[in-house]
């Protein structure tokens, strides 16, 4: 049975509330509103750039032409604008109408509503059937009570978070999926969300003032969130279209029923496609042949508060046509399911001692080599065979390579294979040198290089680059001290990167607070750049340091504290470390003031608090400098 939301309900509600709102404007607190003004009489068309909107203002002020000049007092006299279906593309100039309380611009061609931002007295805004997407410019309209944005193609309504005073909201016929922000609008008594793409209505659970709620033509399957809305007079829930995530087709298909009433009980399907059956809590089908989807229709009368509604719709389960691909590696078979008509994900290439993997073929000996970038899964099961070819013999080359610093202990051999009886030493003494590769060979799937006049080593031990590359280089906030100075030095850049020069032995900085500025990673290790006393020193291996402060040690808290009488001369810092370069001042200026502690950290056994006033961030100080009572 088809139901239809009657639009007259919306406008009856609006008319009644409009009278109340108009009285509220008249008897309000008289607060002044900031708005743009004109200082001399100005032609209408110079103020309102859109021709159609200029005509609307002309008619409103009973002027003969849009070339007529108007004063700010005349513009101040306009308290409402009704210009539906007027081909208006822009409301530029409306910022000069500070006393507008009601604005009806349905059926126009508006996209940008930024000029509305300063209409502080606006209580009623109707923009149905436009092309408005961005709602952020409404955030300061604190008197806005009723808002209608139906038929706009809106998908993001997070801009409504700043309008908790709204009492009626109409968002039907849009593309909304996420209504989380509506949980903040607890004063709503009327809400229309029909004909959207909403499935999760949990954010509505706390809107207990709702009297009229329109949710038809969405993707809703669970009504539990509505159970507490006892003030409802009108509720619409018909024509839900619920689409499950696609699953693989099976001859005997079982799909859990997820349609739930307000009390959490399952709603029994009324009609099930393809001769399916319902065995609570599952819907079952016997599908000997592939079909691309199955579905069931549900219907459930619902009563919430005074509202009676028919909760009905369809649940559709899309099905994927899948077949089995078998990967055969010399008789060892691995199987996987793949959807018909899609590309197959290439498996990891297999290895075979003394052979090179050639590719996956449709036959053991020959056939078609499968191209994972262009070939698609057919509508039947099939096997792909791993085909290998004998390894190529070694060949002459002429290359230049460098030892990767972290591979200095890798072996050098008489022949291209890892055998201790053939080992001639390590690469350590050849670091930082340009080495000539005169031959290459493959063995066991590994590429080997012969270093001229030295011997064979794996290609993975060598690099095209003389210097290490940094994997990342980022700013950090931390403090550390030297833990192990032996054998460690400080460099202008991370060691073995281009331009790195020796600065000093690390032992020179033993016992000093080292402020960590940056972190970088090379193949050797992770490095810290540090400063002492405000002076940048250089880079050091992080393994040589003991980091006693990092931001992850900070924990949020909420306390009230006061400066202890005898601690006014103590300092506060940018971070919880007593280091002069990050010192920000003393506590004297905050004596007898109420301070808020919003974060704490324990650094080397010492508790620190991050403090601020109600309006100003101060910094970190030792907890011992503060007390709980004034």
UniProtKB/Swiss-Prot annotation:
Q: What is its main location?
A: secreted
- In the UniProt record, does the keyword Nucleotidyltransferase occur? no
Gene null: resulting phenotype: Deletion of inlB alone decreases host cell entry; the reduction varies from 99% to 37% depending on the cell line tested.
* Ranges occupied by LRR repeats: 75-97, 98-121, 123-141, 142-163, 164-187, 189-207, 208-231
Q: Name one GO cellular component term.
A: cytoplasm
Effect of mutating residue 332 to E: The B-repeat fragment (residues 31-392) no longer scatters host cell colonies, full-length protein reduces MET phosphorylation and downstream activity about 10-fold
Which residue numbers delimit the LRRNT domain?
31-76
Stretches the record annotates as GW repeat region, necessary and sufficient for cell surface attachment, interacts with host C1QBP and with heparin: 399-630
> Record's SMART domains?
LRR_SD22, LRR_TYP
Q: Where is the signal peptide?
A: 1-30
UniProt GO molecular function:
heparin binding; lipid binding
Domain spans labelled LRRCT: 241-330
Compartments where found: Secreted; Cytoplasm; Cell membrane
Q: Where is the GW domain?
A: 393-467, 472-550, 553-630
For the region Ig-like region, give the residue spans.
241-319
Free-text function comment from the UniProt entry: Mediates the entry of L.monocytogenes into normally non-phagocytic mammalian host cells. Its host receptor is hepatocyte growth factor receptor (HGF receptor, a tyrosine kinase, MET) which is tyrosine-phosphorylated in response to InlB. Downstream targets MAPK1/MAPK3 (Erk1/2) and AKT are phosphorylated in response to InlB, which also causes cell colony scattering. Complement component 1 Q subcomponent-binding protein (gC1q-R, C1QBP) has been suggested to also act an InlB receptor, but this is less certain.
Record note on domains? The N-terminus (36-79) resembles a truncated EF hand, the LRR region (80-240) has a curved form, while residues 241-321 form an Ig-like region; the whole region forms a curved tube. The LRR domain alone (31-241) binds mammalian MET and stimulates its Tyr-phosphorylation; the LRR plus Ig-like region (36-321) are required for receptor dimerization; adding the B-repeat allows the protein to scatter host cell colonies, and the GW domains, especially GW2 and GW3, potentiate MET activation.
- NCBIfam families per the record? GW_glycos_SH3 (NF033202), List_Bact_rpt (TIGR02543)
Name of protein: Internalin B
Print the organism lineage: Bacteria, Bacillati, Bacillota, Bacilli, Bacillales
Q: Give me the gene this protein comes from.
A: inlB
């Amino acid at each position: 049975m088809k139901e239809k939301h009657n639009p007259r309900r919306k406008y009856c509600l609006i008319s009644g509330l409009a009278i109340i709102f108009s009285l509220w404007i008249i008897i309000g607190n008289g607060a002044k509103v900031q708005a743009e003004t004109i200082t001399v009489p100005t032609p209408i068309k110079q103020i309102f750039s859109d021709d159609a909107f200029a005509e609307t203002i002309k008619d409103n002020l009973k002027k003969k032409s849009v070339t007529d000049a108007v004063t700010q007092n005349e513009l101040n006299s306009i308290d409402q604008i009704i210009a539906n279906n007027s081909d208006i593309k822009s409301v530029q100039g409306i910022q000069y109408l500070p006393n507008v309380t009601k604005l009806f611009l349905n059926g126009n061609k508006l996209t940008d509503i930024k000029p509305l931002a300063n209409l502080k007295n606006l209580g009623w805004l109707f923009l149905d059937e436009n092309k408005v997407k961005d709602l952020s410019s409404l955030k300061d309209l604190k008197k806005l009570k009723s808002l209608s944005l139906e038929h706009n193609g809106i998908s993001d309504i997070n801009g409504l978070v700043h309008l908790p005073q709204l009492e009626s909201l109409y968002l039907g016929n849009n593309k909304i999926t996420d209504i989380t922000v509506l949980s903040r609008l607890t004063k709503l008594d009327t809400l229309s969300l029909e004909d959207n793409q909403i499935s999760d209505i949990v954010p509505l659970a706390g809107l207990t003032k709702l009297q009229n709620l329109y949710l038809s033509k969405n993707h809703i399957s669970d009504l539990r969130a509505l159970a507490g809305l006892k003030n409802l007079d009108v509720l619409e829930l018909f024509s839900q279209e619920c689409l499950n995530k696609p699953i693989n087709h099976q001859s005997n298909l079982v799909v859990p029923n997820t349609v739930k009433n307000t009390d959490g009980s399952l709603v029994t399907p009324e009609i099930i496609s393809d001769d399916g059956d319902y065995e609570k809590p599952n819907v079952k089908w016997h599908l000997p042949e592939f079909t691309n989807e199955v579905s069931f229709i549900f219907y459930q009368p619902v009563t919430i508060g005074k509202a009676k509604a028919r909760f009905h719709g369809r649940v559709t389960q899309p099905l994927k046509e899948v077949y089995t691909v078998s990967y055969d590696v010399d008789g060892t078979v691995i199987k996987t399911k793949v959807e018909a008509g899609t590309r197959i994900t290439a498996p990891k290439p297999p290895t075979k001692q003394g052979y090179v993997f050639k590719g996956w073929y449709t036959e053991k000996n020959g056939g078609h080599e499968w191209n994972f970038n262009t070939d698609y899964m057919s509508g039947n099961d099939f096997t792909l065979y791993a085909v290998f070819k004998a390894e190529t013999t070694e060949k002459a080359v002429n290359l230049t390579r460098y030892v990767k610093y972290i591979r200095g202990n890798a072996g050098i051999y008489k022949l291209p294979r890892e055998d201790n009886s053939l080992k001639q030493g390590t690469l350590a003494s050849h670091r930082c040198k340009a080495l000539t590769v005169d031959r290459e060979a493959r063995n066991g799937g590994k590429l080997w290089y012969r270093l001229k006049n030295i011997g064979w080593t794996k290609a993975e031990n060598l690099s095209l680059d003389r210097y290490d590359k940094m994997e990342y280089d980022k700013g950090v906030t931390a403090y550390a001290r030297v833990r192990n100075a032996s054998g460690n030095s400080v460099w202008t850049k991370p060691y073995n990167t281009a331009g790195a020069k020796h600065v000093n032995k690390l032992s020179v900085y033993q016992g000093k607070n080292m402020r960590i500025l940056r972190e970088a990673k090379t193949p050797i290790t992770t490095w810290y750049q540090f400063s002492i006393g405000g002076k940048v020193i250089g880079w050091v291996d992080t393994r040589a340091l003991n980091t006693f402060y990092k931001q992850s040690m900070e924990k949020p808290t909420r306390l009230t504290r006061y400066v202890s009488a005898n601690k006014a001369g103590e300092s506060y810092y940018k971070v919880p470390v007593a280091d002069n370069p990050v010192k920000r001042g003393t506590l004297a200026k905050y004596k007898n003031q109420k301070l808020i502690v919003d974060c704490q950290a324990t650094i080397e056994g010492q508790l620190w608090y991050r403090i601020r006033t109600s309006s100003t961030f101060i910094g970190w100080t030792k907890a011992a400098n503060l007390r709980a009572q004034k």
